[in-house]
Amino acid sequence: DNSLDFSLPSMVPIELDLDIGMGESNIDFTDLILSRIQIEGGMGEMNVEMHKPNPMVCDFLKIDTGLGSFEAEGLGNINAREVDIEVGMGSADIDYRGHFNHDVEINIEVGMGSIELILPENVNVKAKVHHNFLSSIDMDDLIKKGNYYLTDDWVSDRPTVYLDISVGLGSVDINLR
């Protein structure tokens, strides 16, 4: 049984680059000050959580899953301006609810895998989806207007989540809760 437990300082901004090949990872970012994060998972199971708002804006959050599974709770609390999510042949269940008061751009690329993304109900959403007839897209909580999917109750003074989604043979499920 190989395991590693460690803590990071909670009083200084941290830039993280995590590359985890195989195995199970449980990562709790709560109480950290995060300025930039890159997470790469190979064939393992990764669980990430953030239960309190990041006290600073995180410039960039990148999540790259290979064949493994990725689950996250409270990622909106990371307070990122730009998010890149790449899902190869694995799966990602991402709860992006949390506290953020600015617009965020989320770019999602799915190959043969699947992603379920939960966004907070109290934000505007504008999504552009690039897919083909082999892709599965579920955007039931959004309405299609022209080339975009939008929140039905758009309010100009609340944050907007801009989604740019590309799907190959995989599936994408976007929900508002």
What are these regions (language model features)?
Residues 1, 48-177:
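Short, surface-exposed interaction patches in beta-rich subdomains
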Residues 1-13, 17-26:
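Membrane-embedded segments
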Residues 17-56:
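Right-handed parallel beta-helix
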